[in-house]
């Protein structure tokens, strides 16, 4: 993997900097590194592809070295370099695709394609290593089963989940009370509702709670908490739990009371925030517990009182809610990230070449399925293919 990254980094720099008119002295170190790459690769043969519709390709290396000059790089010099660069870029691209479409239930962190296994050989260690990539650093740590520290701006830690729980229900579905939620990506939307606006609740207050367990521990998280659940602020028709009928939800939004958010790790409370909105920070957690109340307004103007009558029919439904967004966090596991393209790159290559479903990843790289059942085998394989995708992204946009 180090060699593949070094090849890609060298080729990217060469493609960007070996251009007509450039002073040789400005790129002499790069050309020396480029020539070392050629010397190491010359005389070797590789084969890529041969899985799904990814074509089998054979690669052989026999390239001349780039010379020295006292002046600027001319057109002939650049053209010679470009021919070599283009071949190497095509090779690296195919090695990356070959690696991204393979998986293994055992030791999935290690190279799976024959081409990358060959590049891991001792004779290729002469290619200059550049381990400045965070993905490469973490791949090396994970490969040695040491502590890793992936940073994600918006980790897709929540599997998609959208449902409701009714604490009060009738066959007619005309006086309901309960909770509905939508968890997905890095966001939680939860709403508590009471058709009767807590008219018969103790002290005219309804209590709601929503608990979300994460598939992996997050640390040093910056979070936005808002006193509203925008996703549940408009009318909708909802299928009943048994699928036998539908019921009407017509929310009127109230501000939640006594809001509390707790971040827990292994059942122990790490951080607690009460009635605090905007930006908050959670140090270390694997569970989020949200609790809030719906309080019937003690004083109402006639127009508000008309929305919340003391008896049925209840045409408007009192609703309170919260939105929680994880803006950034550190996770030692590999996760899809809204600010990165690794999952999209891997998935698109596997779809483009009709790669058959293997023993590790779900069909279509379904992220909800993958993160819901996030086994060590899946994590190892995901770590490897995301690392390769990050290498490929340097050369192929």
From Swiss-Prot:
The N-terminus is blocked. Sumoylated with SUMO1 and SUMO2. Sumoylation of viral proteins seems to have a positive role on viral replication. It holds the Pfam family Rota_Capsid_VP6. Signal peptide: none annotated. Zn(2+) binds at residue 153. One of its GO terms (molecular function) is structural molecule activity. Transmembrane segments: none annotated. The keyword Metal-binding applies. One of its GO terms (biological process) is fusion of virus membrane with host plasma membrane. Ca(2+) binds at residues 266, 286. SUPFAM superfamilies: A virus capsid protein alpha-helical domain, Viral protein domain. Its main location: virion. Residues 62-73 are annotated as: Interaction with the inner capsid protein VP2. Keywords: Calcium, Capsid protein, Intermediate capsid protein, Metal-binding, Ubl conjugation, Virion, Zinc. GO terms for cellular component: viral envelope; viral intermediate capsid. It is found in: Virion. It comes from the Viruses. Intermediate capsid protein that self assembles to form an icosahedral capsid with a T=13 symmetry, which consists of 230 trimers of VP6, with channels at each of its five-fold vertices. This capsid constitutes the middle concentric layer of the viral mature particle. The innermost VP2 capsid and the intermediate VP6 capsid remain intact following cell entry to protect the dsRNA from degradation and to prevent unfavorable antiviral responses in the host cell during all the replication cycle of the virus. Belongs to the rotavirus VP6 family. The VP6 trimer contains a zinc ion located at the center of the molecule. The zinc ion is not essential for either trimerization or transcription activity of the DLP. Zinc-depleted VP6 has an increased sensitivity to proteases. HAMAP family: Rota_VP6, Rota_VP6_A. Homotrimer. Interacts with the inner capsid protein VP2. Interacts with the outer capsid glycoprotein VP7. Interacts with the outer capsid protein VP5*. This is Intermediate capsid protein VP6.
């Amino acid at each position: 993997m180090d060699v593949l990254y070094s090849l890609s980094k060298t080729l990217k720099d060469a493609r960007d900097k070996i251009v007509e008119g450039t002073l040789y002295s400005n790129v002499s170190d790069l050309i020396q590194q480029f020539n070392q790459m050629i010397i190491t690769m010359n005389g070797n043969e590789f084969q890529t592809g041969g899985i799904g519709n990814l074509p089998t390709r054979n690669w052989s290396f026999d390239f001349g070295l780039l010379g020295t000059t006292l002046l600027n790089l001319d057109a002939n010099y650049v053209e010679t370099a470009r021919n070599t660069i283009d071949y190497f870029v095509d090779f690296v691209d195919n090695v990356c695709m070959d690696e991204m479409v393979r998986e293994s239930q055992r030791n999935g962190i290690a190279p799976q394609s024959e081409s990358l296994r060959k590049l891991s050989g001792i004779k290729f260690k002469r290619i200059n290593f550049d381990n400045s990539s965070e993905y490469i650093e973490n791949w090396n740590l994970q490969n040695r089963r040491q502590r890793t520290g992936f940073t994600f701006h918006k980790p897709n830690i929540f599997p998609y989940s959208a449902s409701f729980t009714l604490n009060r229900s009738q066959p007619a579905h005309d006086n309901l009370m309960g909770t509905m939620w939508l968890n997905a990506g890095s966001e939680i939307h939860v709403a508590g509702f009471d058709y009767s606006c807590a008219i018969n609740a103790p002290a005219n207050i309804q209590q709601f709670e929503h608990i979300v367990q994460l598939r992996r521990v997050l640390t040093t998280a910056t979070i936005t908490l808002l006193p509203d659940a925008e996703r549940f602020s408009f009318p909708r028709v909802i299928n009943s739990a048994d699928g036998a009928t539908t019921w009407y939800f017509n929310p009127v939004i109230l501000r939640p009371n006594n809001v509390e958010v707790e971040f827990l790790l292994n059942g122990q409370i790490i951080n607690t925030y009460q009635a605090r909105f905007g930006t908050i920070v959670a140090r270390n957690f694997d569970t989020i517990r949200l609790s809030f109340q719906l309080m019937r307004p003690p004083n109402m103007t006639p127009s508000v009182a008309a929305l919340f009558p003391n008896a049925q029919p209840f045409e408007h439904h009192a609703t309170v809610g919260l939105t929680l967004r994880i803006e950034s966090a550190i996770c030692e596991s590999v996760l899809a990230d809204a600010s990165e393209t690794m999952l999209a790159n891997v998935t698109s290559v596997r779809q483009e070449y009709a790669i058959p479903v293997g023993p590790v990843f779900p069909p279509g790289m379904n992220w909800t399925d993958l993160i819901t059942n996030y086994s060590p085998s899946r994590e190892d394989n995901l770590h490897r293919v995301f690392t390769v995708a990050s290498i490929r992204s340097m050369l192929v946009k």
